[in-house]
Swiss-Prot record:
Enzyme class per UniProt: ligase
Role description: DNA ligase that seals nicks in double-stranded DNA during DNA replication, DNA recombination and DNA repair.
GO molecular function, one term: DNA binding
Gene: lig
Active site, renumbered: 250
Cofactor(s) demanded: Mg(2+)
Catalytic activity, as annotated: ATP + (deoxyribonucleotide)n-3'-hydroxyl + 5'-phospho-(deoxyribonucleotide)m = (deoxyribonucleotide)n+m + AMP + diphosphate
Keyword terms, alphabetized: ATP-binding, Cell cycle, Cell division, DNA damage, DNA recombination, DNA repair, DNA replication, Ligase, Magnesium, Metal-binding, Nucleotide-binding
Enzyme Commission code: 6.5.1.1
GO BP: cell division; DNA biosynthetic process; DNA recombination; DNA repair; lagging strand elongation
Record PANTHER family: DNA LIGASE 1, DNA LIGASE 1/3 FAMILY MEMBER
Identification of the protein by name: Probable DNA ligase
Binding site for ATP: 248, 255, 270, 299, 339, 416, 422
Protein's UniProt keywords contain Magnesium: yes
Length: 584
């Protein structure tokens, strides 16, 4: 299969502002793809060569790409850098240079060649690896047409800019190989259990829907985490959960999914990144505490060994290094508090109800001074829930996670729903909690910010439509250093038009690929004629907007755009806020 076909589809997708057209283009592409290549085409279409958890990265920045391009086009790197500044995009600059110089490709690029070349670049390490990477990439550029060069350059620098989401891929795969998006739920469950789009695509293409139904949990492949909705009223929480729930402490730590098979251990972050190397001590604690093959979920926190008290979340950031040494382990000792088990000795536990999973967890875990279970209390009245909430706050927690005890309280991998409800409270604001919102656009600033953005258009995520819907426009809370950092992150992801997965009434001065999640606070949620979050769901011809928004200073690099606060959460927060006003 020629790489040209992919490049042409990417160009078509980049130009559309319609998600329906994006899905349609992907369906057409997947139908044209040979079955043996479908996994590679899926990976390349999201700018990857493997799932996130493998840790395979190109480690090939723009400067290396320019060196390779300079070598192929036989022009100075400085000239290329100048064009990149003019175009604002290395890929587009490369395409135009190819055309202007009348570059003649030395052959025809295939998808296999591109994939294998990129894989070899990702695997190149050690002495001389940089030169090997440049040489491999240059060999691909030599065979590229102008359009192919554009997408090769974007791919290698991890700035593909198509913004194709997981749900969009899953929908397109379902239509392409089963004839209907109705089957997406089956395909999605297989993905939620394996976190590998390419793997699921290949099974679907080769073995059909029945093959996908046989996909099982595997130790070493992270399960996409179940997520909680949020509420700030104990009355509503109990009502939502049938009058009774299991309330658990919500620690301000790092959520980790731990896997064990014999002597093999894997630790995965909330974003499904392999972080095994960051916690060698935690692995030893788990080895002692659970003598079984397992997949468990826990919160890792830094503790004071003398008092057992939990230290601030920021101290955990010192573990985010390439090589964790004895110094890190001693200076920032961690403990793990387990809250779920989804696999035990070959058995998938995700379809068992929460009370049964908790009972299994209590039976198999040997408590130590570094491994424990998240404290839990079964509550059926507001007073008990409130008292347990205050107890959690006093012990340094963020609040509670209230869990359904019903027979249908299964582990919903990759889903956010009301089987789990976060109960947090911010007494300084009418707004019950901060929002994690995605940057989708920018507006020109004034004074020192003239010519670049001075405020950002922020959106929530709607998993039903796989769309980002606007909530607010924020320009306060940012320092000059923040603006510099934001420019570095956002400008390489600037688009010529609104992204097809962004639903916005407002016309931004510049648009960005949905990528960066920021923590935003504000005064209150109000009805809005210009924001699309909850449009028509709480009032005709109105959405929900956030008044007096402010950046808290927290960049949520641990969250993907699809992990942002959902539209439904904001609707619930708005309704809750109105009830509080009525009562007061």
């Amino acid at each position: 299969m020629e790489y040209r076909i992919l490049a042409e589809f990417y160009e078509r997708i980049e130009k559309t502002t319609s998600r329906i057209e994006m899905v349609s283009s992907l369906v057409e592409l997947f139908k044209q793809t040979p079955k043996e290549l479908i996994d590679k085409v899926v990976y390349l279409s999201i700018g990857k060569i493997a799932p996130e958890y493998t840790g395979l990265d190109y480690n090939f920045g723009e400067k290396l790409a320019i060196r390779a391009l300079s070598r192929v086009l036989k022009i100075p790197a400085l000239e290329i850098e100048k064009r990149v500044r003019q175009e604002g995009d290395l890929g587009e600059a490369g395409r135009k240079l190819y055309e202007e110089l009348g570059f003649k490709p030395e052959g025809t690029l295939t998808v296999e060649e591109v994939y294998n070349g990129l894989l070899n670049i990702a695997k190149a390490v050690g002495i001389g690896s940089q030169e090997r990477k440049i040489s491999i990439f240059a060999s691909l550029l030599k065979k590229a047409t102008p359009l192919e060069a554009k997408y090769l350059l974007r791919t290698i620098t991890e700035r593909l800019r198509l913004g194709i989401g997981d749900n969009t891929i899953l929908e397109a795969l379902s239509i392409a190989f089963t004839g209907s998006s109705v089957n997406r739920e089956v395909v999605e469950r297989a993905y939620n259990l394996t976190s590998d789009l390419g793997y699921v695509a290949k099974i679907l293409a080769e073995k059909g829907l029945e093959g996908v139904k046989q996909v099982k949990i595997q130790v070493g492949r992270p399960v996409r985490p179940m997520l909680a909705e949020r509420m700030s009223s104990p009355i509503l929480i109990l009502r939502k959960l049938g009058g009774k729930c299991g309330a658990e402490y919500k620690y301000d730590g790092e959520r980790i999914q731990a896997h064990r098979k014999g002597d093999e251990f894997y630790l995965f972050s909330r974003r499904l990144e392999n972080i095994t190397h960051q916690y060698p001590d935690l692995i030893e604690f788990l080895k002692e505490a659970i003598p079984h093959d397992f997949i468990v979920e826990l919160e890792a926190v830094v503790i004071d060994p003398a008092s057992g008290e939990i230290r601030p979340f920021q101290e955990l950031m010192h573990r985010k290094v390439k090589y964790v040494t004895k110094y890190h382990i001693t200076k920032y000792p961690v403990a793990g508090f387990l809250f779920d088990i989804i696999y035990l000795d070959g058995e998938d536990l995700t379809l068992k109800p929460y009370p049964e999973r908790r009972e299994i967890l209590e039976k198999v875990v040997k408590r130590t001074d570094r491994i424990g279970l998240v404290p839990r209390k079964i509550v059926d009245n507001v007073e008990d829930l409130e008292n347990f909430f205050y107890q959690a706050i006093e012990e340094g927690c963020e609040g509670l996670v209230c869990k359904s005890l019903a027979p249908n309280s299964i582990y919903q991998a990759g889903k956010r729903g009301f089987l789990w409800i976060k109960y947090k409270r911010d007494y300084k604001s009418v707004l019950a909690d901060t929002l994690d919102l995605v940057v989708v656009g920018g507006f020109y600033g004034k004074g020192q910010r003239k010519g670049t953005f001075g405020s950002l258009l922020m959106a929530c995520y709607d998993p039903e439509s796989d769309m980002f819907k606007t909530v607010t426009k924020v320009g306060t809370g940012f320092t000059e250093d923040d603006f510099k950092k934001l420019e570095e992150i956002l400008m390489p992801r600037k688009l010529n038009h609104r992204h097809p997965r962004v639903n916005s009434i407002l016309e931004a001065d510049m648009w960005f690929e949905p990528y960066l999640v920021l923590e935003i606070t504000g005064a209150e949620l109000t009805l809005s004629p210009v924001h699309t979050c909850g449009w028509g769901k709480v009032s005709p011809n109105r959405g929900i907007g956030l008044r007096f928004p402010r950046f808290t200073g927290r960049y949520r690099f641990d969250k993907r755009p699809e992990d942002a606060t959902t539209e439904q959460e904001i609707i619930e927060m708005y309704r809750m806020q109105r009830k509080i006003r009525v009562r007061s």
